[in-house]
Regions:
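Conserved NTP-binding catalytic cores of kinases and kinase-like/nucleotidyltransferase enzymes
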Residues: 1-109, 235-243, 353-357
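An alpha-helical support segment within catalytic cores of ATP-dependent transferases
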Residues: 26-31, 152, 174-224, 350-354
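Active-site acidic catalytic loop and adjacent metal/ATP-binding pocket
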Residues: 42-58, 62, 204-258
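Conserved structural core of kinase catalytic domains
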Residues: 101-135
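A glycine-centered beta->alpha junction motif in the catalytic cores
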Residues: 114-127, 145, 149, 177-184, ...
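A cross-family kinase active-site recognition segment
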Residues: 126-194, 220, 332
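All-alpha amphipathic helical-bundle segments outside canonical DNA-binding/catalytic cores
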Residues: 158, 288-304
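Active-site activation/catalytic loop segments of kinase-like enzymes and analogous catalytic loops
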Residues: 253-288, 304-326, 333-341
């Protein structure tokens, strides 16, 4: 038995800890090694997303570190397929999340996953290093180009999310239905009316936005779906920089611009031009062409509006079903996002796209 294993995450209130501890003992060789838990660190713990922890163990005099993550079963399946099947199928298996094992709790409501720990090599968006950013871009472009027209897209679509224009259309429709069903108190009525009008406007713009994707969106491909820099690791090795993409929980199928827009928005506007230039050069090497920046801005805006609309749904359902007190706070935050939305790329005034927002 690994010393201290019985206390792993004992004060977190998480489900499935018994199953997690048994899996950790198997992975660490608890029957033969002299081992002990030395540290646990919470990396992420939010009510509506995965809970992530770093665990460190002393094993026969050396320190071993791993990441454990509590996820919903449907998200586990996407991450598992990305790590074990999709990425290896196109020669990118060693650029994935390093999944070691998974175990479902008795209720079937959640799954623990154990991953390799890639240390503090997360991509820095505040002070971006060009070489590391380019290594990350090279990997993402490889994913996009290798999966365009790939026969696995049908499987990816079945298990993953639809992130094209259908995502925009269905998300906006669902957000409107959920919000219309709320009965706001008088003090929240201005927010309610304002947010509804924003959603109606986004819905009415669908034909023009769908047409833009028809003309400029390019082929469907595998999308990471949550390409924040916190999910991109660039690791120094003896052979140079080695990029990895973690957290494939929200992966799916759609146009490459979905991932491009998410990635660019993590950086300050002053960095986006050179990052886009690097991206344009990389896709050109693969035989693709980046759309003109005016059209890119319009597509980026469309995808951000879809993401904002998606964030309306669960607070609105919470208000409709339970009058959840956090619901109006969440909706106020989303309303402010709509208000603050600006073009991803800064263009010359005469070259700027005419926004429909």
């Amino acid at each position: 038995m690994i010393k201290g294993l019985e206390r792993v995450l004992e004060n977190t209130g998480n489900s499935g800890l018994g199953e997690l501890r048994l899996m950790l003992e198997e992975l660490l060789g608890g029957n033969g090694a002299k081992s002990s838990l030395i540290e646990e660190e919470m990396l992420r713990s939010q009510a509506h997303s995965a809970r992530v922890y770093r665990l460190r163990f002393a094993i026969d005099g050396r320190v071993s570190s791993m990441i454990v993550k509590l996820v919903k079963p449907q998200n586990m399946r996407r991450s598992e397929l990305a790590a074990k099947h999709w990425l290896p199928a196109v020669g990118l298996g060693d650029h994935g999340p390093g999944l070691l094992a998974s175990v479902t709790d008795r209720s079937g409501d959640c799954v623990w996953q154990v991953y390799e720990d890639f240390g503090d090599n997360e991509l820095n968006c505040r002070q971006p290093d060009p070489d590391r950013v380019k290594a990350a871009i090279q990997l993402v472009v490889q994913v996009h180009t290798r999966f365009a027209g790939n026969p696995l897209l049908g499987e990816i679509r079945m298990y993953g999310r639809e992130l094209g224009t259908h995502f925009y259309e269905s998300t906006v429709r669902d957000a409107i239905l959920a919000l219309e069903a709320c009965r706001p108190p008088e003090q929240q009525r201005p927010l309610y009316e304002r947010l509804l009008q924003r959603l109606y406007k986004v819905r009415d713009e669908l034909p023009a936005r769908a047409q833009a994707f028809e003309e400029w969106g390019g082929p469907e491909t595998l999308l990471h779906g949550d390409l924040w820099t916190t999910n991109v690791f660039v690791i120094p090795t003896s052979n140079g920089l080695h990029a990895r993409l973690i957290d494939w929980d929200l992966s799916g199928v759609g146009p490459a611009s979905y991932d491009v827009s998410t990635f660019l928005l993590r950086f300050a506007p002053c960095h986006r031009a050179w990052i886009l230039d690097a991206w344009t050069e990389e896709v050109a090497r693969a035989g693709w062409r980046m759309p003109p920046q005016q059209e890119l801005n319009f597509m980026f805006e469309t995808q951000e509006l879809a993401r904002y609309s998606n964030r309306v749904i669960w607070p609105a359902i919470g208000l409709f079903e339970d009058r959840a007190p956090w619901g109006w706070e969440e909706l106020q935050m989303v309303d402010q996002w709509f208000e603050d939305l600006k073009p991803v790329l800064a263009l010359e005034p005469e070259k700027s796209a005419t926004s429909l927002v």
